[in-house]
Amino acid sequence: MAPVFDPYRLASVSLDVLAAGRAGPGALAARQRARLARLRETIVRASRFYREHLAGIGPEVPLAELPPVTRQALMARFDDWVTDPQLRLADLKAFTADPDAIGQAYLGRYVVWESSGTSHQPGVFVQDAATMAVYDALEALRRSAPLSTQRWSDPLYLSERLAFVGVLGGHFASHVSIERLRQLNPWMRRSFRSFSILQPVAELVEALNSYAPTVIATYPTVAVLLADEARRGALRFRPRELWTGGETLGSAVRRRI
């Protein structure tokens, strides 16, 4: 089954992202208000949970004054929370229990992520093609500094060896995103490998040294670990690019890396 991807929507969103990047504070604030109004209208109409949760609260009430919700409350009423009645928590749990389905489209049109449950409540998150287009556009246009000479000559990373270092084996956002990327770009299936952070550090270092990636994607905490290994001479390669996500990258951590 093909991964969730709409090239026309991606093109449209990319143009919108570029336009927003040139907008002033007033225009951005107006855009935010309009989008929030559409979002509230949609969830009140299509989500039973939010229709009850926001009952009696008019659209003029500011976002900061809306009653908050918790992940526990949302997951407890998942089937009422979603806006598509075809989405059912029991079915989604069966889908995320299948490791062979990582990165595959659910019902032919959704990307599904799960959280590890570090807050004692695992979450299930469903993304449609419109959402993925926004993620893809932001990743492509705002993730990094302006393109270097290397990237202009190789925008598809054909000459690179890419490595994702993270938690594997589940439908976690980063792992699903990497698998989806591989499916969308077949040339990356051999040049983009994944390495589990749950293995002993010595084994991870040995595996990375054997592969010698030129680009590493990982979490800031893992990037610090790898930087420390490089500092003591254990890593025998020097990547040209390091991508981080999933956690906040503070200035002190950035300097250390």
Question: What do these predicted regions represent?
Answer:
Residues 38, 45, 167-257:
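Conserved adenylate-forming
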Residues 1-114, 120-160, 210-217, 236-237, ...:
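Nucleotide 5′-phosphate-binding alpha/beta core
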